[in-house]
């Protein structure tokens, strides 16, 4: 996709954020939270991923999500000239996504009806200075650093999408892989719909076509496919895999206990990431 199209999507995304931010049941997560709020726009991000924060029974949560998305869609269509809203199916067949279009530009707003709540308290942040200069101001509830990047690490091993690998690349280059982050990542693994062993020792997938079609043109600085493959290789190096395997065995045993989440406090990051 051409960079111009990505830019127009970010413009629509930033214009939509104030109406989403009014709903305190949601916090922003994923690439948009990382690259527009936490970092100074190293890459463009074109979807709005939300975490539903209240921890309530499933049916009550689904009803509230439905009502809240309706309010968001109504506010956007009323305040953004030419904006059109369409509810579309998300996880589990529920209509937990909004498609927001303005002319030829389309973005998606979505939340998971399954993965609800956060591990750590949320923050209220404003977009970075560069984002404000180029696209305008926005402020919103954002997941904590550990939740943001714990979820991002989970996405990286689950999907191996170039966007996720790029975000992990900058994590390695900046904050690094802390014990608190690793424990939060394990909680996301435990909450996943996939078996933990598949995420702690994933199979390699071919990402070249996805890189060309869904990533090239998004970053400020040019990024080669090999750069992202190196991030993945680092994660699957012999030292790292050995550490993962040890962690996986301990984690799998702990996960069968009555209260698995409370047993994660003594887990440490793999030795490959010790500084």
Located regions from the model:
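Compositionally biased terminal segments of proteins
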Residues: 1-275
């Amino acid at each position: 996709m051409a960079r111009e199209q990505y830019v127009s999507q970010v413009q629509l995304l930033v214009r939509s954020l104030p109406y989403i931010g009014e709903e305190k049941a949601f916090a922003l997560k994923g690439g948009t939270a990382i690259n527009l709020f936490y970092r100074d726009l190293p890459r463009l991000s074109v979807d709005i991923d939300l975490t539903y924060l209240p921890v309530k029974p499933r049916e009550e949560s689904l009803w509230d999500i439905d009502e809240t998305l309706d309010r968001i869609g109504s506010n956007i269509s009323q305040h953004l000239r030419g904006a059109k809203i369409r509810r579309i199916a998300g996880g589990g067949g529920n209509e937990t996504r909004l498609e927001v279009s303005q002319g030829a530009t389309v973005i998606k707003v979505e939340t998971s009806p399954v993965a609800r709540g956060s591990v750590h308290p949320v923050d209220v942040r404003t977009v970075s200075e560069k984002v404000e200069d180029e696209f305008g101001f926005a402020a919103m509830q954002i997941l904590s650093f550990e939740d943001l990047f714990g979820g991002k690490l989970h996405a990286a091993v689950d999907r191996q999408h170039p966007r996720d690998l790029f975000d992990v690349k900058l994590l390695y280059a900046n904050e690094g892989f802390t014990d608190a982050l690793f424990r939060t990542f394990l909680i996301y693994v435990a909450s996943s719909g996939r078996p933990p062993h598949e995420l702690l020792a994933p199979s390699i997938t071919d990402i070249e076509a996805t890189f060309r079609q869904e990533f090239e043109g998004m970053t400020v600085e040019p990024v080669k496919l090999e750069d992202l493959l190196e991030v993945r290789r680092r994660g699957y190096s012999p030292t790292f895999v050995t550490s993962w395997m040890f962690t996986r065995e301990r984690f799998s045993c702990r996960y069968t206990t009555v209260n698995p989440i409370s047993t994660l406090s003594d887990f440490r990051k793999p030795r490959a990431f010790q500084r």
